[in-house]
Structures are given as structure tokens and as C-alpha cells.
Regions:
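Exposed, low-structure sequence patches enriched in small/polar residues
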Residues: 2-216
Length: 216
């Protein structure tokens, strides 16, 4: 084995101001016999800075944060870039709300796709008996087709409910919907995999998951 893995980070967490910087690298020939490596040939750098105000009333704390990251391969080609601005509110009763705006670049089949996305979400966990939450994301997304990749529009919604009526029993329900459309008419029937309807919809997927466990 001749490959290598490098990971370095610095973090500072204060009462109001927090920041972090990190970098890691996975060489193209990195292998391991004791685990699975999702991706090699990667150099990544990222950073985060956030600030919090603490009214400590019905609004416990709130504040903005900024995240930025870049991924290069070992040929110095930029493959991914992401910048995110987020605003987070934490309320009494273990309730959280966030809004975020993303600017991203994703490289696929030698093409750089520039994306703009928006998201809003939150959760309520004011009781040990349950937790409910969800999010909504929308914006540009890549249609990953080897023959004709293009930039379309995606909306995704997720709602979940966790129930814990007794200490030994837990139940979780997830409802997910993802809808992808081609507003610019770039889908080519016969060349692209899949179909597109008269409204430009390429797919609309609904997934419902339920899992219950009881510990004896």
C-alpha cells in the first residue's frame, strides 16, 4: 500500500463567536483493509464561522453562520465548491428553526454546473415522548445522465416523526418527496434516460419509511 490519508483541523468555540478550519487529503491509490473508503483522489479544504446572540428569553439564542468548502483532485482540478449562509433560531422547549442559502459548483462529466439553492427547516422536541421535524429545499440541481447531463430545478420535502412512549419502544416515520423538472427544455427524449411530461416534470418520487423497535 503506497497511498496516504491526511487530516488536520482547528476549532475555536466561544460563548458568542465560533470558527473552524480543516483540511484533508486522500491520495488516488489509498486503500484500507479494515473499512470502506467512499472517495479517494481528493483534497478538501473547509471553514466555518458563526456568531450567536443569547437573549435567553422565549428565544434562547440566534445567529448567522457561513460555511465554505472546496474539493480538488490530485490533478488540481476543482470538482466541488460550496458556500452556505445560514440563520438559526433556537427557542424554548427544544425547538429549532433554520434558513439557509447555498451557492454551489459541482463538476460532472467534465462540465461545471453552477447551482443556487434555498432551504428552510426545523424540529420540535419539547417532550421526551416525541420529536417532529422537517425541511424544504429547492433550487438548481444536476440531472446526472452520462449522455446529456443538464441543470434542472429540484424541490424536496421531508417530514419525520419520532415516538418514544416508553423507554423500551421507539418508532420513526419518514415521509420524503423529491420533484425534478426541466424548465429550460434541455431533456432530449431518446438520448436522456427517463421521460419528461408536458409540464417539464422528469420525476416525482415519494418515499415513506417506518421503523419500530422494542428492546427486551
Amino acid at each position: 500500500k503506497t497511498g496516504y490519508f491526511l487530516d488536520a483541523s482547528f476549532r475555536k468555540t466561544g460563548r458568542r463567536l465560533s470558527y473552524r478550519a480543516s483540511t484533508y487529503a486522500l491520495s488516488p491509490d489509498f486503500e484500507t483493509d479494515v473499512g470502506f473508503v467512499r472517495r479517494t483522489n481528493l483534497r478538501r479544504g473547509s471553514g466555518n464561522i458563526g456568531y450567536e446572540w443569547r437573549p435567553e428569553s422565549w428565544l434562547v439564542n440566534w445567529g448567522p453562520s457561513i460555511d465554505y468548502s472546496r474539493n480538488y483532485n490530485f490533478d488540481q482540478i476543482l470538482e466541488d465548491e460550496q458556500a452556505q449562509a445560514r440563520l438559526t433560531f433556537v427557542f424554548r422547549g427544544n425547538t429549532r428553526l433554520y434558513l439557509n442559502s447555498n451557492r454551489e459548483m459541482e463538476r460532472f462529466r467534465g462540465i461545471d454546473f453552477e447551482k443556487r439553492r434555498f432551504g428552510v427547516g426545523g424540529r420540535v422536541a419539547s417532550s421526551r415522548l416525541y420529536q417532529v421535524g422537517g425541511y424544504y429545499n429547492s433550487g438548481d440541481e444536476v440531472y446526472f445522465d452520462n449522455a446529456n447531463p443538464f441543470l434542472g430545478y429540484e424541490e424536496s420535502v421531508r417530514l419525520y416523526l419520532n415516538l418514544n412512549p416508553v423507554s423500551r419502544f421507539q418508532s420513526r416515520i419518514d415521509v420524503n418527496n423529491t420533484r425534478f423538472t426541466d424548465p429550460n427544455g434541455r431533456f432530449i427524449p431518446g438520448l436522456n434516460e427517463g421521460d419528461v411530461d408536458e409540464n417539464g416534470q422528469v420525476f416525482n418520487v415519494n418515499i415513506v419509511r417506518a421503523l419500530s423497535t422494542y428492546q427486551f
